[in-house]
Amino acid sequence: MNYTTALPDFIEMQRVSFCWFIAQGLNEELNTFSRIYDFSQNTEYVLFGQEYSLVKPIYNIVRAKKYTANYSAQLVIPLEVRNKKTNIIKYHSKFPIINLPLMTSSATFVINGCERVIVSQIIRSPGVYFEKNKHQKKNKKIRKLISSEIGKLKSFTPPSEILPTESRLYFLKPTIKKKLISDKKKKIRFIKKEEYWNWKGESLNIYSFKQIKDYEIDFSTSFVEHFKVYNDLFKIRHLSTKIKRIKIFLKWLACNNKFSLPNKKHLIFLLINSFNLLSRTIVKYKILKTRNNENKNDFILNDYNQIKKVYDQVLQESETLLSLNINTQILSFILRDLEKFNQLNNFNFLKLNITPKIKVIIANDKIKSSLYFTNSFKELIKFKYNFTKKEKDKKRNQSQATIFKNKTKYLKTKSKIIQYKDDHLIRDIYKKKYEEKELYTATLIPEYGSWIRFGFQKNTKINISKYPIKNQEDEIIIQLDKVTQKPIIHLLKEMGVTDLEICQNLQNSEFFYFNKPILTNSIHQPNKLLRFNLNKNYYKNISEFSRIFDPSYYRLGKIGRSKLNNRLDINLSKRITTITYEDIFAIIDKLITLSTAKQISDDIDHLKNRRVRSVGELLQNLFRIGFQRLLRKLRSQTNKTYSSQLSSFNIVGATIKEFFGASQLSQYMDQTNPLSSLTHRRRISGLGPGGFDRDRISFAVRDIHPSHYGRICPIETPEGQNVGLIASLTTCARVNESGFLETPFWRVINGKVIKNRNPIYLTADIEDFYKIAPADISTNQENYLTKNLIPVRYKQDFLTVTPSEVDFIAVSPIQVVSVAASLIPFFEHDDANRALMGSNMQRQSVPLLLPQKPIVGTGLENQIALDSGMVINAQRAGIVESVTANKIIILEDSGRHYKYDLQKYQRSNQETCINHRPIVWEGEKVKSGQMLTDGPGIISSELSLGQNVLVAYMPWQGYNFEDAILINERLVYEDIFTSIHIERYEIEIDRTAEMSEQTTNNIPNLSISDVQNLNEDGIVTIGTFVKPGDILVGKIIPKDDSEQLPESKLLRAIFGAKAKGVRDTSFRMPEGEYGRVIETLTFNRRTKLAYKFEKIQIFIAQIRKIQVGDKIAGRHGNKGIISRILPRQDMPFLPDGTPVDIILNPLGVPSRMNVGQLYECLLGLAGHKLNRRFKILPFDEMYGPEVSRILINKKLRQASIENDEAWLFNPYSPGKMVLLDGRTGKEFDNPITVGNAYMLKLIHLVDDKMHSRATGPYSLVTQQPLGGKAQHGGQRFGEMEVWALEGFGASFTLKELLTIKSDDMQGRNETLNSIIKGQPIPTSGVPESFKVLVQELRSIGLDLSTYRIDEFSSNQSYEIELNLIEKYNPLLKTFSHTSNINNISF
């Protein structure tokens, strides 16, 4: 077996998918909806889905196409309707639910007589994907000037609000035990139930008492605490509360700073830095106290300047201050009473004599340290007591009573204290682990249901007392759409999961829980949890988020389950297709792990994360939607009769009809030629329901991905806005049962390619784990790799390894590209953009009358012709018994006769001609699957889309400027580029109740020659050649009496004339169309007396020769328009006298970089001279460097020797030859590249584009002529054309174009009238588009008025307002007189 040409069945994907749907998919859906209940739950509909049957179609495929019907089978299911209360069966019978369109053997559907294709869809695979947030704000580090402690403090304190409100001021009960820790410099007591700790020390990474003992700790007042408190006091708007709060704060501050502490230089430095903020607060407070002052502004300015001056001075002297041993703190000035404070004229406390003053203040101040000002619940509750040796015993006796007595001094309510155990202190690991995390988002894509997102979110609404975790800025939320979201723990608790369960199921539980939750509802404590101390009533109402666990709303499917198991390392059964708690826990864990480990997020464009939904699965989803609609309809119907309820089953059929008729994925089949129809069925679309939206999609999705190798073609994709969203399957790719794309490879073991078995198909995710060599690696006869170093792909990267390390090798060089691209010879020498155009333009090639097989091909032509569906293949082996133009009869081995009907001159969807020509003869033995006929663009079993013509690359009198093409008249006379096009005209007979049209050949006021080609029924006879204006169907309609004048009625009454007049409403051939009638079809409706025509179809065949304006192209993206047809004698000719057929511009090659066309035309010339054809596979470097060039040179040399024509090969300029000018007979100056290229005629024919308009329809709103040939529109005089006229100053021409020739309604009517009467053309008015603009501006609230400016005179206004919109004077409110002329509208 030659492995390079052994390709799979090209439309296997579609056929297998539909067969799966009929056999299995349909069954699955019918089982899901086997029992349906109505609204009252009394009536039950039982569908016996296992026993469904398909009734044979009424029309076969040929008849369905001919009579514009559907090729569909009736789906019949036994249905039972019974009343549940009474248990009475109302109905039990086989019920026809829908007409299911059936797939033809060539993977198409016949809907309304047209062949349609269901394009496969590529979508994101169900599963979970983790993505790094693109716009993550990085935490800004505080400048190092403020010392390293600030960074620690910042990460340590929460970002939430800190206000001295009741709920955040906490006290101790008198029963608490005490423990003393001695220190050399001072004694500090820690109050401890199970554990307490004062976090205000300088070493912020200490979390246990053991560590405290090892350090000498100074429990000084924290700057951050002051800073945060002041910051929040600023935010209070209500003045009286602000004053109260500041008072409380000042008193508390006084308590905390009672004792002078040893000097700490960094502390002073920190406080100096915060001084600016504090000074502003003081000024504000002063203003509050003195707000009745008259000279308030002066006071503020004066005072602020004074403070600012001091502040600046302090900054300057900071170094001096730090060098002195100041045993104090700068903040102590706030300790004074506010009255005293206001009296201070200068800041004496900054001087060195501050210590005695502090002592005085302390002596006067009687406030005890009864108030603890906490930042949030998350800090460990602490109180600080300082003792001297003398006071120790006295204080010990009094302290408990004092605390208890004073604890409610400033509070109205009591607050509970949350207690902790020693062994569950916040650990250093938490801070290290989550401080530097990166934010990720997880997206869970179910097979059915909306996407679910999990992500980190800053908790802005956090209630401090309920969230006591250090550094907990983010929480994980679950999001169903852009609006609905909630914290994930809320959802789990809603569903009844206890905290202990949550904590035990999460590996990263410390992200949520700062100690291990004890069982809830404990006797001693209502809730041991720290973070989720929420009101229990909150969990009583279950939200819509609980739906994610409901299979009727969200379903993962088998694929989603296996993907989830693999990605999250969980081991759930594949039968569990719903989302479970275990999935949620695993996703949370993975999300936290990724954010801390900072791993690479998933590549959503990798093919392992995208799957293909073929016809079968799309239809299965459609059935599900249909049955769900039925369910809703039956449940919404109450008190309906049972027969009307049965009729509501039609909704399923309507859903199917809607999909085949209107869905983005159901497309009108491209039948231009066999290749276009084949590639259309192999197309993969990213658009459609559940897919991408082409307006919002990024470049990353459209781009080529390494995993596309051998699965999706990197070349064939549309140009324009769909680029990259619509792709094509490669030649060898197939879709596996899960919907993932696979491609074949040969196994390589120890450097030997194993080819004796079938190739191994690998999916994209498995392929990443192996080292895979490309197909263009040469092997010897024993299939061993010959090179020492082999380039391989491994994990989407390129490596070079030894042959023994290679695991797989690609099957074929054309494995990478699609069917259309694989037809381009030498395409490795073309730029990718041009190869893309080449593969797209081959699909637009028109099947020619006399096509030729390409001299230079690639070897796929036969396979494409076979799988295209445009030829007839033998169903079984046998012997041909008879062959005619219309049918082939084969005697099978079993003795049965099998008749094959050939299509003769049938119209395709693109109006090209489908015609079968038999290629077998009587008595020939045929095998199963063998081609019996040729089709359009197929000659002797090979795809032949164009013609081999002699091409020269040279300029010729400027006629090939800008890709224009010169052709020889031989191409016209010898019908080389002639094609047949079949057009269908549909004429409907109007049969209204009063006046019915009749078809007849007896039409009044026509000569015999006008009606001689009509039959008795008035229909044109087959074989007639019709020209524009010829009658196709003769129709008349009787004139109504009401239309007649009274005089004629009187005359009829006097003379007794009974005959009424008739009006001619015949259908005539449109302008610019011509051709021969090849078929007429009539659609009848039987009445009591006779058949009456309802609709008549007439098929007309045109033979179109090539002409100026037609588009032709090569296979390498070298397209052009024919600019001139030259006589043979004027064309340049070869030394042997052969004139060139086509002249192309040589400038089209270097900039386009499609050098493949030169290789093709030169090898084509050699093949033409040697009478030999070549099949060239791409990527020839495997045989040696520059093999293509060597092959061509050798073949040209061989041709020149065999034909004894030395001019064919010049070793000094190979491929170029001397040409002679046909007009003069002289040689051209330089040798010219000449060769046989394969050229295609494209469907963009000038006959279809030619269009003219005199008068025609106008747009309703703008009153401008419509655009386009279909609307009989005009040519748009666009912006650039207006610039051209403006540049020449042609103002009158411009005015004419913008008004009377366009949208000045009154002006154009008056102009026509004056032209008819021979009067001068009147002045133009205001264009309608200007009026529309005025109205649009008014609709958004801008009143734009228009004025007429008259000659200036002092006694009257020279500006008169005009109303352009309505024809009346707005001042008089009376309608103005309209023009005398009659309005003539077109």
UniProtKB/Swiss-Prot annotation:
GO terms for molecular function: DNA binding; DNA-directed RNA polymerase activity; ribonucleoside binding. GO terms for cellular component: chloroplast; DNA-directed RNA polymerase complex; mitochondrion. It catalyses: RNA(n) + a ribonucleoside 5'-triphosphate = RNA(n+1) + diphosphate. One of its GO terms (biological process) is DNA-templated transcription. Its EC number is 2.7.7.6. Its main location: plastid. Gene3D superfamilies: 2.40.50.100, 2.40.50.150, 3.90.1100.10, DNA-directed RNA polymerase, beta subunit, external 1 domain, DNA-directed RNA polymerase, subunit 2, domain 6, RNA polymerase alpha subunit dimerisation domain, RNA polymerase Rpb2, domain 2. Disulfide bonds: none annotated. The keyword Cell membrane does not apply. It holds the Pfam family RNA_pol_Rpb2_45. It is found in: Plastid, Chloroplast. It is an enzyme of class 2 (transferase). In plastids the minimal PEP RNA polymerase catalytic core is composed of four subunits: alpha, beta, beta', and beta''. When a (nuclear-encoded) sigma factor is associated with the core the holoenzyme is formed, which can initiate transcription. Belongs to the RNA polymerase beta chain family. This is DNA-directed RNA polymerase subunit beta. The lineage of its organism: Eukaryota, Sar, Stramenopiles, Ochrophyta, Bacillariophyta. The gene is rpoB.
